């Protein structure tokens, strides 16, 4: 909503771990995660801002097939990403970090091992400037545009938490 973090909560655990927790344990862990969220995330000037430390932020809503728009910018040496349905991730990073392979650009499905993981092209704007993702997820298939350039075209997102199961 651009004013506060209504609709958001702290990341507790991957989907498989969450299912195994008792209601009481899940509630306790959620309270801890929400406290960490409040320490490191804030709504400011219509944007969600992260301190660069702490845990992930997740929506309270559940989505099936979806399209989303995300405006983002990253700092020098930054490394981040967007989890889709709790699975990592559409990669965001400083492309000058060649020692970790970041020269391939942002937008790839970084944790894919069997299939396509790198972007089709580098479409990142310079560090410290705004970039825009359009992400579509239909079933386990992901398409990503970065700054209106197609970087991932209908690729299956692999299940990072259990490589033998689909998303």
Residue ranges of model-derived segments:
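Carbohydrate-interacting regions of secretory-pathway proteins
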Residues: 1-167
